[in-house]
């Protein structure tokens, strides 16, 4: 990853997919020694269907194993977390775990991918603790309450996010590209 030391801190099952994910991630140069291998659990899976413009039509997933990524698990790695150059998280982990991470990251910038309109509400009250947010159109609308009918609305949404303390917004607009603020 651009010649930088990178770690994956996640939970995987003791199944074929978990072992494959760890092996391929290691092969790509990412350290996986902070991953939790959960016996008897399935590794997360996700499938989405996109329309011709790149907008998601529907998605299904099994993220049950992410419940094992808890504040208790993260607290075992507090020095590692606070020594990072940047933390990238998503909203698949529980709200309490996300809040713990945001409260304990110290001065480390935290980048967040909301992952869905349903899950993004976990961070609504914590935007000031997030350095960079990468929502899609629907996630940005859900968080801000502002309709994104065209690119002109992106600036209004960006102002809303920055007013609520967010440092950087990378807004995915599907077929309309990306808005960066």
Feature annotation, model-predicted:
Residues 85-86, 132:
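Structural motif
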Residues 99, 106-181:
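Conserved phosphate/ATP/ADP-binding segment of small-molecule kinases
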Residues 2-85:
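Conserved N-terminal subdomain of the carbohydrate kinase-like
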Residues 16-19, 96, 118-121:
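Short, charged/polar "capping" segments at the starts of alpha-helices
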Residues 92-99:
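Active-site-adjacent beta->alpha loops and helix N-cap segments on the catalytic face
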Residues 21, 99-101:
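Aromatic/hydrophobic pocket-lining residues that form π-stacking "cages" and hydrophobic walls in ligand
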Residues 10, 89-91, 112:
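Glycine- and other small-residue-rich loops at beta-strand/loop junctions that grip anionic moieties
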Residues 1, 102:
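Histidine-anchored nucleotide/phosphate-binding helix
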């Amino acid at each position: 990853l651009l010649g930088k030391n990178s770690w994956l801190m996640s939970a995987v099952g003791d199944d074929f997919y978990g072992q494959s994910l760890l092996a391929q991630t290691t092969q790509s140069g990412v350290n996986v020694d902070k991953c939790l291998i959960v016996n008897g659990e399935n590794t997360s899976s996700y499938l989405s269907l996109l329309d011709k413009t790149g907008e998601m039509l529907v998605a299904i997933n099994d993220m049950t194993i992410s419940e094992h990524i808890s504040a208790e698990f993260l607290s075992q790695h507090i020095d590692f977390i606070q020594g990072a150059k940047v933390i990238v998280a998503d909203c698949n982990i529980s709200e309490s775990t996300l809040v713990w991470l945001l409260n304990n990251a110290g001065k480390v910038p935290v980048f967040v991918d909301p992952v869905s309109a349903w899950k993004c509400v976990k961070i609504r009250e914590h935007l000031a603790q997030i350095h960079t947010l990468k929502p899609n159109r629907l996630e940005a609308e859900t968080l801000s309450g502002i309709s994104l009918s065209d690119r002109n609305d992106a600036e209004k949404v960006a102002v809303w996010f920055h007013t609520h303390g967010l440092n950087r917004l990378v807004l995915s607009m599907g077929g309309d590209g990306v808005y960066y603020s």
